[in-house]
């Protein structure tokens, strides 16, 4: 029993601290660009030039994204732990889906901080390997929604939507924070799958994919803020 209580305390603390880090990284991301100006519409040559001139900024931006993703995963893990008290199997399955999303996200984000800057430098300098680097950088475009890079990102968000649908109902509780989080997660899960069906039906143009899908993900920020209050309240009650 003592071990269980101690673990609950640690996970509530993990969830709270993770939620705070998510908010901080969200603020930072507003000031650090993740791609060349123009994003989707940027020409390849302009992107190469921008990446070469802004190498440190680009890497810093994506390191911030890695921290944000891992922190949000911490919040989700704490949510999965919370629902596991009354729904153990669903909690375990939700945690597994969350872990798969981490793998889906970490691959492209590591590529952003390791591979893409090297590719841009190789192309700019024209050294051995530049012929290979050029098509690779095109494939790993961080803004075009059908590149290999962004495909992993959207896979990660889809796994988030599956997680959201799995935990939305059991998370709902008497506290206002859990009600807000539950409804927001449910809406995110439903909206993401509706958008996915619309995309498959050809109703969403390539240029609108990012704004449509990532716009829905703003609901996750609502979840994060609400759960920060919930985790803090749980921590305070444990001290009494």
Predicted regions and their residues:
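Hydrophobic, aromatic-enriched alpha-helical segments typical of multi-pass transmembrane helices
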Residues: 2-240
